[in-house]
Amino acid sequence: MDYTQILIKPLVSEKATFVKESSEQVVFFVNPRANKIEIKKAVESVFNVKVAGVNVVTRKPQARTKHGRVTGQTAGYKKAYVTLAPGEKIDFFEGV
C-alpha cells in the first residue's frame, strides 16, 4: 500500500488538539486496512519525523433506522494516535 493511501487526513477536534498540546501525539484518520507498522513508516516518510509509537482505534459501522422504515448504517473509520519521539513536532497549520 502506498504511503499516500495510508494517511487519509489529520483529525482536528477538541480532544485531538488537547492530546497534541499535552503530549507529543498527533491523530490521523487512516486506511482501515493499514496496520501499525505501515502507519509508522508512512508518518516518518511523509513528515520526516521519528515515531515512538502508534495506537489504533477502530470504529465499526453501526446500523441506523429512520422513521421505522429506512435502514442504513453509519460510516466506520480507523484513527491512529501517533506518538512522536522527544523533540519532534508536526505543525499542520504553519502560517495560517
Swiss-Prot record:
Coiled coil: none annotated. One of its GO terms (biological process) is translation. Keywords: Ribonucleoprotein, Ribosomal protein, RNA-binding, rRNA-binding. Transmembrane segments: none annotated. Gene3D superfamilies: 3.30.70.330. Signal peptide: none annotated. It holds the Pfam family Ribosomal_L23. GO terms for molecular function: rRNA binding; structural constituent of ribosome. One of its GO terms (cellular component) is ribosome. PANTHER family: 60S RIBOSOMAL PROTEIN L23A (PTHR11620). HAMAP family: Ribosomal_uL23_B. Belongs to the universal ribosomal protein uL23 family. Part of the 50S ribosomal subunit. Contacts protein L29, and trigger factor when it is bound to the ribosome. One of the early assembly proteins it binds 23S rRNA. One of the proteins that surrounds the polypeptide exit tunnel on the outside of the ribosome. Forms the main docking site for trigger factor binding to the ribosome. This is Large ribosomal subunit protein uL23. It comes from Oleidesulfovibrio alaskensis (strain ATCC BAA-1058 / DSM 17464 / G20) (Desulfovibrio alaskensis).
